[in-house]
């Protein structure tokens, strides 16, 4: 059974400081929802496009100013929205993003740019229907980064991650859910999966109370997290 959503789909953004487990959760959610019959598009920011590639290179060197990084992020996001996010939502797909504009607000805000201006510059970007904020103490995130063999970049200092965590917590956006990312990966997945199934109830192409809608919800909620 293919699970059909209404036009507009469902936009899920997974956010949090470095080391919180965003990429792992995004991939496992995509696998779980796909196995249940949903059409899923998995993407990330920065993207692999020219602006995103330049940003990742700068993260290793720290040579760009916060304003220069913000400008590249906006260019990257415009392209991402136009070429992938908006078309997928129009088809009624579930779009899962490993980072989105809240990361720009948190990280560039932690670098000193005004939060209200950062939000205003992202007004063009579709707002997530579900914003999963993976909350984690920075020392734990840094320990995870080192455990996987990576050297922390210039963003990944405890002081900077503390500032980012504070901004993430203060963001007042619809659809925001805080998930304890210090729990094991399976527990985090179960929490996130339950939140998404609840959000999907009114997005199904068949009403959730019809036989088709009930069957779709049963598949989604009964699908074992991968």
Swiss-Prot record:
Gene Ontology CC: cytosol
Bridged cysteine pairs (disulfide): none
GO molecular function, one term: dTMP kinase activity
EC number: 2.7.4.9
Catalysed reaction, written as an equation: dTMP + ATP = dTDP + ADP
Pfam families: Thymidylate_kin
Residues that bind ATP: 16-23
Family statement drawn from the similarity comment of this UniProt entry: Belongs to the thymidylate kinase family.
InterPro entries in the record: P-loop_NTPase, Thymidylate_kin-like_dom, Thymidylate_kinase
Function noted in UniProt: Phosphorylation of dTMP to form dTDP in both de novo and salvage pathways of dTTP synthesis.
Biological processes per GO annotation: dTDP biosynthetic process; dTTP biosynthetic process; dUDP biosynthetic process
Domain of life: Bacteria
Designated name of the protein: Thymidylate kinase
Record's keyword terms, sorted: ATP-binding, Kinase, Nucleotide biosynthesis, Nucleotide-binding, Transferase
NCBIfam families tied to this protein: DTMP_kinase (TIGR00041)
Native species: Xanthomonas euvesicatoria pv. vesicatoria (strain 85-10) (Xanthomonas campestris pv. vesicatoria)
């Amino acid at each position: 059974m293919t699970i059909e959503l209404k036009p507009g789909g469902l936009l899920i953004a997974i956010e949090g400081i470095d080391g919180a487990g965003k990429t792992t959760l995004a991939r496992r959610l995509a696998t779980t929802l796909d196995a249940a019959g949903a059409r899923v598009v998995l993407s990330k920011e920065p993207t692999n496009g020219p602006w995103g590639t330049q940003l990742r290179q700068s993260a290793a060197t720290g040579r760009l100013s916060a304003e220069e990084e913000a400008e590249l992020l906006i260019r990257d996001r415009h392209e991402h929205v136009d070429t992938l996010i908006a078309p997928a939502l129009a088809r009624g797909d579930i779009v899962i993003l490993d980072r989105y504009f809240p990361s720009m607000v948190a990280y560039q805000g932690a670098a000193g740019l005004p939060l209200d201006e950062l939000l205003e510059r992202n007004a063009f970007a579709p707002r997530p229907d579900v914003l999963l904020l993976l909350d984690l103490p920075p020392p734990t995130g840094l320990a995870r980064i080192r455990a996987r063999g990576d050297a922390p970049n210039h963003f990944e200092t405890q002081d900077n991650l503390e500032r980012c965590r504070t901004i993430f917590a203060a963001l007042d956006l619809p659809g925001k859910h805080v998930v304890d990312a210090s729990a094991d990966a399976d527990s985090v997945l179960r929490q996130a999966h339950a939140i998404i199934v609840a959000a999907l109830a009114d997005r199904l192409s068949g009403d959730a109370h019809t036989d088709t809608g009930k069957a779709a919800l049963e598949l989604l909620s009964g699908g074992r997290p991968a």
